[in-house]
């Protein structure tokens, strides 16, 4: 089964980094990668539908406009079943606490450990089966 991953980050180089790090898994059909540059754009993509439908969202916290914690709150209102992993360069206790309180599945600090992230994604996918 292919899992769609929606990566939400306002930094354009993040999309390229994720494309590089997940190149093999995308080629093998394990993951389908989707990208949004803002919280608002992520909500539009979710409303329009993302295929395949099993989705994991990876969102930066610090973004202009709707930040990642606001996005997390909106996603949990609209699609509470979707796992959302927060990714941030700021791993302070307050952000970690808020992310957990708002329903984040994971809290990941940058630079991203992609081996660990892939393990966490596999675990989420296995739990959904």
Descriptions of predicted regions:
Residues 58-60:
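Active-site T/S-Asp motif of two-component receiver
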Residues 94, 112-122:
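C-terminal output helix
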Residues 70, 91-108:
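Alpha4 helix (beta4-alpha4-beta5 surface) of REC/receiver domains from two-component response regulators
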Residues 25-26, 47-52, 74-81, 102:
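Conserved phosphotransfer cores of two-component systems
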Residues 12-35:
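Two-component/phosphorelay signaling modules centered on CheY-like receiver
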Residues 63:
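Receiver (REC) domain active-site loop signature in two-component systems and cognate sites
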Residues 19, 35-56, 77:
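Acidic, metal-coordinating helix/loop segments flanking the phosphotransfer/catalytic sites
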